Amino acid sequence: MSRKLLTLTLLVLMTACANDAPAPLQPMVLDFAKLGKINLAVAHLSYMNNAPRPPTKDVAVFQNYKPQLSDALYRWGVDRLQASGTQGQATLVIHDADLRRDTLPLKTGIDSWFTRQQSERWSGKVTVDLRIEGAASNFAGNASTTVTRSTTLPEDANAAERENAYRRLLRSMMEDLNTQMERAMRDHLNSVILTMP
């Protein structure tokens, strides 16, 4: 009798261990408002997404992660840019918002049996352009930047590892974009910047 009870207990424990899924991650929230508004001497601010559609094979890898890269770029514009003038138009144009997955070659041989190799590279590229037209004194100009980043994933990466890799990639790209766009705006659009933190 005790042998049957022991066997049943072991089966229950094994089943419980097999079904242990990683705890779901909290939704990723990108908040650029804490960085402060960049007030521009224009009356209107708009957003345009001209990014080409990514290859189908890459869409399938990234489509379920939130926020999507183009949504994060839009959020940056809403949180950071403010039209505070009486004339002129500012347009934040997304030219590229691309994420790609590449397979990495794996080593073979006995040594490879005991190491967890990096099997995938996820790469991201963003190009944005802030265009100013018809501002005071008929000022027209633009500030643009391109950001590229990548991260690797180990072989047989689980769902949590993949989600964390996406978050790392997205967060690092957006931090780079913020820094580079601030610099580009100071260099090329200084005459229409009213205030910048």
For each feature predicted by the language model, list its residue ranges.
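Short acidic, glycine/tyrosine-flanked loop/strand segments centered on an H-E-D-like triad
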Residues: 43-55, 135-162
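Bacterial signal peptide processing site
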Residues: 18-21
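C-terminal/domain-edge helix-coil "capping" segments
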Residues: 157-197
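Surface-exposed short loop/turn segments
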Residues: 88-142
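Post-signal peptide N-terminal segment of mature Sec-exported envelope proteins
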Residues: 25-46
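N-terminal segment of the mature soluble domain
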Residues: 39-103
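C-terminal motif of bacterial Sec signal peptides marking the signal peptidase cleavage site
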Residues: 13-16
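Bacterial N-terminal signal peptides that target proteins for export
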Residues: 1-6
